Every structure is written in structure tokens, then in C-alpha cells.
């Protein structure tokens, strides 16, 4: 661990992406492209070797939205959508060291959801881990400095264009918590 990690107990470099679970990823992508000016830049699904879900990565400014649908009704993503409707499932944060950040969060009381794992392909190595946030929302810690491909292994680039409406970045996130459920 370097000195910067000691000085800041949870060094977050920024929001990497916000993932929405939706009933129809292709339709939702069309909506966010044409209604809000997000450009579809990457795709993952059966055509890229991912058999259980389909995802589109959308960008505008420094904002990345990951729009994901399940391909079977018994998938956890389908259960999320049945319970909540289309909604935010993951607010992923870019960090310098995903494993260290995960362990530190769990040490401080966070509930671990996904232990640190490595994803790799010919474009390098991506590291990630996840903790519970609130309700059924999670926070994924993403370490990207060793990865130089299109978003993540299993994604291929898209060449679509969209008319940006000028959104720059996500500057904060607000959670809606059910009455009586906030500590």
C-alpha cells in the first residue's frame, strides 16, 4: 500500500459508470441516445460470447451509462426489473486498487457482494469487486489502469453517433430509501 492510500482511507478517483438494469436494453439505449444525447460506444451479448445478458455502454462527456438486460426470465437482472422496474443497479467507482479498496470497505463494515476478481483479454487486465450499497443497489470498485480495450472484456466497439445535449459528468448521486429504512 502506498502513502496516498494511508492518507485517504477510501480513495475514489471518480464514478466509472452507472449501470441500469432494464427490461429491454436495445430499446432503453435508443431512448437514452435520442432523448438525452448519449452515444452507444460498446456492446456485450451473445455475439461477443456473453450468453446470459446484453449490455450497451453509452457515453456523453465523462458519463458512462451501462444499460443491461437479462436474456432469461430467471436471471437475477430479470428479478431486479420485476421488483423495481428499470433502475440503477450499480454505481461503479474507479479506484487505484480494487482489492485493497474492497478489503478496506469490508473491514469498515460494508457487506461484500463480489470478492475481488480479475477479467482479462488481449487488451489487458481489469480488476473489480463489489459491496452492497442500499436496497438492491451495489457499488463496484473498478481498477482500470491495466486495461486498454473497449470498456471491459466481452465488449466490442460500436460506431453510432448521437447529438450530445451537453452533459459533462456525474457530480453526485442521491438514493431514495423507503420510509423507516434509513439509519
Language model region names:
Residues 1-26, 88-91, 148-182:
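N-terminal beta-strand motif that seeds the catalytic metal site of vicinal oxygen chelate
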Residues 15-22, 38, 58, 65-67, ...:
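Short, structured motif recognition centered on aromatic/hydrophobic residues
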Residues 10, 50, 83-86, 97, ...:
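Short, glycine/acidic-rich beta->alpha junctions
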Residues 4, 36-81, 126-153, 157:
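Conserved short beta-strand elements that form part of the metal-binding/catalytic scaffold
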Residues 10-13, 19-64, 107, 116-122, ...:
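Core segments of cupin and vicinal oxygen chelate
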Residues 32, 81-142:
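Hydrophobic or amphipathic alpha-helical targeting/insertion segments
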Amino acid at each position: 500500500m502506498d502513502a496516498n492510500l494511508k492518507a485517504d482511507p477510501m480513495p475514489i478517483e471518480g464514478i466509472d459508470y452507472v449501470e441500469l438494469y432494464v427490461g429491454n436494453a436495445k430499446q432503453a439505449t435508443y431512448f437514452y441516445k435520442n432523448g438525452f444525447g448519449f452515444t452507444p460506444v460498446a456492446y456485450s451479448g451473445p455475439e461477443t460470447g456473453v450468453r446470459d445478458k446484453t449490455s450497451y455502454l453509452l457515453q456523453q462527456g465523462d458519463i458512462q451509462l451501462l444499460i443491461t438486460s437479462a436474456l432469461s426470465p430467471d436471471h437475477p437482472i430479470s428479478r431486479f426489473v420485476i421488483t423495481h422496474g428499470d433502475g440503477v443497479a450499480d454505481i461503479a467507482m474507479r479506484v487505484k486498487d480494487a482489492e485493497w479498496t474492497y478489503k478496506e470497505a469490508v473491514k469498515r463494515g460494508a457487506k461484500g457482494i463480489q470478492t475481488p476478481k480479475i477479467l482479462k483479454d488481449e487488451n489487458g487486465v481489469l480488476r473489480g469487486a463489489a459491496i452492497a450499497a442500499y436496497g438492491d443497489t451495489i457499488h463496484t470498485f473498478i481498477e482500470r489502469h491495466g486495461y486498454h480495450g473497449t470498456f471491459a472484456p466481452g465488449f466490442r466497439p460500436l460506431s453510432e453517433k448521437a447529438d450530445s445535449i451537453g452533459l459533462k459528468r456525474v457530480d453526485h448521486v442521491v438514493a431514495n430509501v423507503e420510509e423507516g429504512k434509513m439509519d
